[in-house]
Amino acid sequence: FAPGMVSQKCLLCMCKLESGGCKPIGCRMDVGSLSCGYFQIKQPYWIDCGKPGKDWKSCSNDINCSSKCVQQYMKRYATHYRCPLNCEGFAREHNGGPNGCHSSRTLKYWELLQKIPGCKGVK
């Protein structure tokens, strides 16, 4: 995984939750638009993270590029919206988009992440 403010362990847990075991699963329809790859990244998220790699879909299916996108997205939004700078804050921001860390609708995502073996209480 790419280095950054999100811990490697937190990235692994997010990756496992998003792609059923941290796999390059391609694109799937999710709430009316495509989500792709290891972290199920949508095109607007990829644009917001600075458009790393060749293009959105290939970046999403490359573990280094997609984790770099997540790190850059958090650098941009988690600090701006004063999210807790821990795995819960990052995971909820990833799930809910800008300011998602403060939304009650992202609590279920965090609860699901903690049920993954080895992810309970991850920082």
Locate each region found by the language model:
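Short, functionally critical alpha-helical segments immediately adjacent to catalytic or ligand/cofactor-binding
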Residues: M5-K23, R28, I41, V70, ...
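Alpha-helical segment that forms one wall of the substrate-binding/catalytic cleft
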Residues: Q43-S103, W110-G118
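Short acidic-hydrophobic sequence patches enriched in Asp/Glu that either
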Residues: V6, S33, R105
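Extracytoplasmic/periplasmic copper-protein system
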Residues: C119-K123
